[in-house]
Design a protein with these regions (language model features):
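Histidine-centered beta-alpha loop that forms part of the nucleotide-sugar donor binding/catalytic region
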Residues: 8, 66, 126-127
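Short, polar loop motifs at secondary-structure junctions
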Residues: 44-49, 172-173
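Short, high-confidence coil segments that cap the C-terminus of an alpha-helix
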Residues: 37, 88-89, 116-120
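N-terminal glycine-rich phosphate-binding loop and ensuing alpha1 helix
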Residues: 2-44
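Catalytic phosphate/metal-binding cores of nucleic-acid and nucleotide-processing enzymes, i.e., regions
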Residues: 1-2, 88
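Short phosphate-binding loop-to-helix
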Residues: 47-93, 101-109
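Conserved core of the sugar-phosphate nucleotidyltransferase
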Residues: 100-192
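Hydrophobic helical membrane-anchoring modules
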Residues: 187-188, 193-209
Length: 209
């Protein structure tokens, strides 16, 4: 299995979030430190990362192509370009540097599940078993419960939310322009491991842990 990490120099909601420090080290280096047992590829537009990634023997950082730069580019397009350039045939695990509490044991367990199954992909999720509502133009409507019949939450239907902690897949899955194939598995990840740094508030929560 190989690991793919897309890293932009600029971010939209948190300024320079990939370079923000946690315990004296930028988030992107925290991520690399967890994957010493794997070959890691970084797609980046950052000269800093292209230079400093050379400190890691198992890491290959390469410059993002001009037509793939910008906030509108899909991560799937980045992965397809990576797989094509390096002729990747192994399973790919894609992660983000903004999951600072990622545990390598979860990655190894997911990798093992894929090996033992006939699944073409596995992705991380949050389990949700609460009373959910949806806001519509005409008002609000329940999703998974009947407000006129109060049930205990443990009796409600279970929903799962992709949390982007990781996506693991065989390269041919990308033919559908997705990271999730036709026979996927889900992998539950609980708080705080599934924390994703997407706002300044998230960053403050991380620091306070």
């Amino acid at each position: 299995m190989v690991v793919f990490i897309p890293i932009k120099e600029e971010s939209q909601r948190v300024v320079g979030k990939n370079f923000r420090e946690y315990k004296g080290k930028p988030l992107w280096k925290h991520c690399l430190d967890k994957f010493t047992d794997y070959q890691v590829f970084i797609d980046t537009d950052s000269e800093i990362i292209l230079d400093e990634a050379e400190e890691y023997e198992n890491v290959r950082a390469y410059e993002r192509l001009d037509y793939l730069k910008g906030h509108e580019t899909s991560v799937v397009d980045l992965i397809k370009n990576f797989v094509d350039i390096y002729q990747i045939e192994d399973v790919v695990c894609q992660v983000h540097t903004t999951s600072p509490l990622l545990e390598i044991k979860h990655i190894k367990e997911a990798e093992q599940r894929m090996k033992e199954s006939k699944s073409d992909s596995i992705f991380s999720v949050d389990k949700i078993q609460d009373r959910l509502w949806r806001k519509e133009d005409y008002g609000i409507t329940p999703i998974n419960h009947n407000p006129l019949k109060l049930e205990q939450t443990q009796d409600l239907p279970i929903y799962y939310r992709e949390n982007s902690y990781f996506y693991m897949f065989r390269p041919e899955v990308l033919d559908t322009d997705n990271r999730i194939g036709k026979s996927p598995l889900m992998f539950e990840v609980e708080w705080p491991y599934n924390m994703d740094i997407d706002t300044e508030e998230d960053l403050n929560k991380l620091i306070s842990l």
